Amino acid sequence: MTTMRQIQLTEWGDESVLHEANVPIPSPVRGHVLIKTVAAGVNPIDLTTRKGLGPAAQLADPSYKPFVPGWDVAGTVVATAGDYTGFKVGDGVFGLVAFPSPAGAYAEYVLAPAHQLVKVPADVPCAQLGGAPLTALTAYQALFEVARLKEGERVLIHSGAGGVGHLAIQLAAQAGAQVFATASAPNHEFVRSLGAQPIDYRTEDFRAVLGQTMDVVLNSTGQQTFLDSLEVLVPGGRIVTLTSPDPLDVARERGFEAQWLTVHPDRMQMQEIARLMSLGLLKVHVDQVLDFSQAAQAHALVATGRTRGKIVLAP
């Protein structure tokens, strides 16, 4: 077999620009391993990039070279370049690959930098592994690298049932924080099972519910929510946003620590995520697993903002 299935686009646009192609399987190069993909997570940044927006789109020109979405990959090493990478053929691996440069994870085979991969934990379903890297790293970096969340602190996590949110709840609870999360009523039992006290964003004003009691807020739902969240922070509190960095100065002028996070690959953090997954302390909720041929449907589902956990593609 010399060719593989790959989902690509040759112009930015809506999900209709995604199409399947047969292309040559890449050959291993130094410092990389060739992975046979088992599962690839679908993330909001995939949709943003597909539209020609965001940092990843600035690094690609689909009219010159077809762009292949995706940065989450889980699979099996099938070839190396012969140099030492720490992996051998047959190893199961997963990771956030090359972000924000093009990684091409929506493909049957992915050529990935070895230093961004870790071995898969035993007895964790493949779909969970494929759905974990970007969202788990985002949650981990937001809470511990940027916000420096500590045991006993109180944290508000917006969109608690979403890809980042449901993992952030688990990580914060494991760290000994008191966790609150916004979610729609149908997701309250789910959010509660993860370790958070749910707040119905449709019928409740989280500012009135919480008062000025939060040490940390993780925002992934836009500028107005960011600004409203300042009302629940204690003096000197910390807020991390995953959306536009525009309102950061407003928060800083009021004495809060405010940072905008763009996730980055980190092998040591991935090893900790793998450890937690192996112990059953961090579980990726997979809403649906779809075939690569259903990539457009996967993007449409993520675009609704109403999926629980992750959408995952499988070849």
Identify the residue ranges that each predicted region occupies.
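Short N-terminal strand-loop motif that marks the start
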Residues: 1-69, 314
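C-terminal hydrophobic helical "lid"/dimerization subdomain
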Residues: 2, 270-315
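Short, surface-exposed secondary-structure boundary micro-motifs
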Residues: 38-39, 80-82, 98-99, 160, ...
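A glycine-/small-residue-rich N-terminal strand-loop-strand element
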Residues: 50, 72-99
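NAD(P)H dinucleotide-binding glycine-rich loop of Rossmann-like/cofactor-binding domains
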Residues: 63, 86, 96-159
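Mid-domain Rossmann-like dinucleotide-binding core that forms the NAD(H)/NADP(H) cofactor-binding site
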Residues: 130-201
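A short acidic, Gly/Pro-enriched loop at the edge of an enzyme's catalytic core
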Residues: 209-216
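Glycine-rich phosphate-binding loop and adjacent beta-alpha segment
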Residues: 220-282, 315
